[in-house]
Amino acid sequence: MSASVKESLQLQLLEMEMLFSMFPNQGEVKLEDVNALTNIKRYLEGTREALPPKIEFVITLQIEEPKVKIDLQVTMPHSYPYVALQLFGRSSELDRHQQLLLNKGLTSYIGTFDPGELCVCAAIQWLQDNSASYFLSRKLVYEPSTQAKPVKNTFLRMWIYSHHIYQQDLRKKILDVGKRLDVTGFCMTGKPGIICVEGFKEHCEEFWHTIRYPNWKHISCKHAESVETEGNGEDLRLFHSFEELLLEAHGDYGLRNDYHMNLGQFLEFLKKHKSEHVFQILFGIESKSSDS
């Protein structure tokens, strides 16, 4: 069943609130119509009958390296996020060809989101993480090229801690996102819930953003390990796939939503995957060998 326009507009207002909290300074978020949000609120409250104009705005992003600015133009169709968002990035430091490539990459990334997922914040993060290469490639066109260097990628492993992971729909989402992004690792359900995700940096960061967005509060990345690699990173992986890890519940409470996972079993699992060192990082206690 398709979502109603009113439901879509409510989600748009929610995302705009998040954007204004992310960019609180005057002029960072510039609405094409300063009354746009007010008109939508009136429409949702029933004091305005006509469908309000679409939300259109520009966000000015400061890219740290190189020191440049990107203006991200955004148009939210009335049925967004259930239909595609309209995005376009501009910068005076990019020529026409590089600007085209930048927007092609951005559009391709946004196309990976499912209908109903808000994605402006993710688009901003993508630009902040990935735009530098487009400016660099423009610079190389005008500068004498030196001996080509192998392209390096960052291989990342994130250790994520949650108070608990019980709900079936959340567990399914975690597995689906992990397999879609071709990362490896595991999700240990129960209390506490532990997730390990490893792969290229951009894939892991997208995984992290997607699973906790929009309202998973009791979750944090406790530890991250990264290394530069010129290969595909396969030799750096500690896991061969992304799977759900089901361990015995301490005290055998069955399916009750208050059971604690058997941390002794979890420690043995970590040892098998050369990750015993993260036990103390995750739980604040030193691991003890079962042989002692």
UniProtKB/Swiss-Prot annotation:
Transmembrane segments: none annotated. Signal peptide: none annotated. Residues 14-134 form the RWD domain. SUPFAM superfamilies: UBC-like. PROSITE patterns: RWD. It comes from the Eukaryota. InterPro entries: Phi-like, Prp3_C, RWD_dom, UBQ-conjugating_enzyme/RWD. This is RWD domain-containing protein 2A. It comes from Macaca fascicularis. The gene is RWDD2A.
